[in-house]
UniProtKB/Swiss-Prot annotation:
Keyword tags: Secreted, Signal
Pfam hit, one: DUF4576
Residue segments, region Disordered: 24-44
Any single Gene Ontology cellular-component annotation: extracellular exosome
PANTHER family membership: SIMILAR TO AVLV472
Protein name in the entry: Uncharacterized protein C5orf46
InterPro entries: DUF4576
Entry's localization field: Secreted
Gene assigned in the entry: C5orf46
Primary location: secreted
Signal peptide range in chain numbering: 1-23
Length: 87
């Protein structure tokens, strides 16, 4: 039970990280500054965070799926062992 709660917490935390990295929040331009439509500012730092968040999520999903497949393999082994002992 504790492991499933821990996994759920990790997944929810990564989901929040994922959503915050991909959020499309553009600040409103102040009225007192002129519109610089000719300039194209590069938001390198948010793109870096986005890529970092994507890598973290991919690695976490891979780890969770790998650990779940390992635990499923152990359960199948336990079930097979139980069948042999009942004969």
């Amino acid at each position: 039970m504790a492991v499933s709660v821990l996994r759920l917490t990790v997944v929810l935390g990564l989901l929040v990280l994922f959503l915050t990295c991909y959020a499309d929040d553009k600040p409103d331009k102040p009225d007192d500054k002129p519109d610089d439509s000719g300039k194209d500012p590069k938001p390198d730092f948010p793109k870096f965070l986005s890529l970092l968040g994507t890598e973290i999520i991919e690695n976490a999903v891979e780890f969770i799926l790998r650990s779940m497949s390992r635990s499923t393999g152990f359960m199948e082994f336990d079930d097979n062992e139980g069948k042999h002992s009942s004969k």
